[in-house]
Amino acid sequence: MPKTDRVIEEITDYVLEKEITSAEAYTTAGHVLLDTLGCGILALRYPECTKLLGPIVPGTTVPNGSKVPGTSYVLDPVRAAFNIGCMIRWLDYNDTWLAAEWGHPSDNLGGILAAADYVSRVRLSEGKEPLTVRDVLEMMIKAHEIQGVLALENSLNRVGLDHVLFVKVATTAVAAKLLGGGREEIKNALSNAWIDNAALRTYRHSPNTGSRKSWAAGDATSRGVHLALMSLKGEMGYPTALSAPGWGFQDVLFNKKEIKLARPLDAYVMENVLFKVSYPAEFHAQTAAESAVILHPQVKNRIDEIDRVVIRTHESAIRIIDKKGPLHNPADRDHCLQYITAIGLLFGDITAQHYEAETANDPRIDKLRDKMEVTENKTYTEDYLKPDKRSISNAVQVHFKDGTSTEMVECEFPLGHRFRREEAVPKLLEKFSDNLKTHFPDKQHKHIYERCTSYETLQTMRVNEFVDMFCM
């Protein structure tokens, strides 16, 4: 057999052997866990999300199955991973990673939590000790790192592929480890994840933007669990899945460029991950949203007097969310820089409801969008790519018909950035509490919040007991 591709070897070594020593990474992972589950709980208010949940065949029962938070479903770990992953991503309100490729590393929690809960319940049935939340946090750190470091220099979007491939790869690696896989099983599963290929980005762009972007990560993380389970049954792998001449991923799909890990795998991504604290909007627009909300008091009574709105931004924002013309659904609207900015200017806040038809039918929104000029600021683009800065800058200025204007409101770092972490954490916990309140009775909400916000209690909790707290 040929020598295994280096990237597959490095990821396998990392998952099996790397000890995570960063206290900051574990603390941040705890916040990611709560924030991500809170986003999933909030999504249960939306029928378009909940219609996709549950067993694929009604009435299916699974002994020692994985439970789906916020529901009464007990599913096999593959289907549970889809359910949890779908909930997490539905409102585009969980964490974000921005680099040559974009993504949301907490999407991997769908597969991680489903696998960990399943393993814990099986162990208990055998009289063994279950996994703890600390084990989940470690796998979250590692999944974040795998997905995020792959994203640093490997741009899937440049070749029309969706970022959820990196979710599938990351989940595959850590799920195989959680389920009891060793070196060969993890390598075999990883090779199959690459050979699977990736979803196209068709559903993220006009004229086809649609709800698949809200369940694509659930699909990817569940596939990761599926491949991990297959490898544990002895399914073979393919050592040069990436590099095989003519037939490997690199030659067929990546313009014959090498897939590489831009830095050693440790805890960099979890330490630097971006939270969506304030607004459920595509992350490249977060600072535009903050700027627009700041300007709201100055413009709210002068909307009809606006001549133009100037937005200065970075190249990635222009490529992903600079949209003109009709927007067809919530998935289209929450990925439109101009729509998000207009909502901030008009209402002084941005919530998930603002993407629904009731708000979108307000004629003032499209009138404002038509008056917007989006231009690239080269410095913003450069700072976006600097590893020690990673800013996501936007600036907004409103010009009126009488020749006056507001100041140019610039925001470099959104509230969820590492540079603003101390400021963000109290608001992040408030967001978690608010999301719980949308679904759980007061007593259950209080019980979950108190146990989860004590870090020592959280990390030592058994996984099955942690999940049980969130179930109906």
Curated annotation (Swiss-Prot):
Domain of life of the source: Bacteria
Pfam families named among the record's database cross-references: MmgE_PrpD_C, MmgE_PrpD_N
Upregulation: Subject to catabolite repression.
InterPro entries in alphabetical order: 2Me_IsoCit_deHydtase_PrpD, MmgE/PrpD_sf, MmgE/PrpD_sf_1, MmgE/PrpD_sf_2, MmgE_PrpD, MmgE_PrpD_C, MmgE_PrpD_N
Catalytic reactions of this protein: 2-methylcitrate = 2-methyl-cis-aconitate + H2O; citrate = cis-aconitate + H2O
Biological-process GO terms, alphabetical: propionate metabolic process, methylcitrate cycle; sporulation resulting in formation of a cellular spore; tricarboxylic acid cycle
EC number(s) on file: 4.2.1.-
Swiss-Prot/TrEMBL keywords: Lyase, Sporulation, Tricarboxylic acid cycle
GO MF entries: 2 iron, 2 sulfur cluster binding; 2-methylcitrate dehydratase activity
Sequence similarity: Belongs to the PrpD family.
Protein purpose: Involved in both the tricarboxylic acid (TCA) and methylcitric acid cycles. Has both 2-methylcitrate dehydratase and citrate dehydratase activities. Catalyzes the dehydration of 2-methylcitrate (2-MC) to yield 2-methyl-cis-aconitate, and the dehydration of citrate to yield cis-aconitate. Cannot form isocitrate. Uses either (2S,3R)- or (2R,3S)-2-methylcitrate.
Protein name in the entry: Citrate/2-methylcitrate dehydratase
Source species of the chain: Bacillus subtilis (strain 168)
